[in-house]
A protein has these predicted regions:
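Short, well-ordered beta-strand segments in beta-rich or mixed alpha/beta enzyme
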Residues: 2-9, 40-69
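Non-catalytic surface loops within mature trypsin-like serine protease
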Residues: 10-12, 59, 95-98
Length: 105
């Protein structure tokens, strides 16, 4: 598994419209992306925290292929509607060190 996150700083007064645009882009451009297991937009619980977009891929190569794809470019071209809500962002990538899944029996 390979994980890419994007920390998106959005002023509270722009949050609702930001979420609408971001969710629309997720639903439009992410289904069918090869190797993409899951995409989650996390809402902050405090006004000083950013939104966090979390994308889980099978491999780093799948992530890189997505970033180079026409779908990625089109989604980010459409992000002009989102960008006006974001005051800053930070992309980070990770490979799991441990993945513990707990379920009830």
């Amino acid at each position: 598994m390979f994980v890419a996150t994007n920390r998106l700083f959005v002023p509270a007064e722009r949050a609702e419209e930001f979420e609408e645009h971001f969710r629309s882009n997720m639903r439009t451009f992410l289904p069918g992306v090869p190797g993409l297991r899951r995409s989650t937009l996390l809402r902050p619980t405090r006004p000083d925290q950013p939104y966090v977009s979390v994308n889980e891929f099978d491999t780093e190569e799948d992530f890189k292929a997505w970033v180079a794809s026409a779908s990625f470019k089109e989604a980010h071209r459409r992000n002009a509607g989102i960008a006006r809500h974001v005051t800053g962002n930070a992309v980070e990538t990770f490979q799991p060190s441990e993945d513990l899944v707990l379920t009830e029996s």
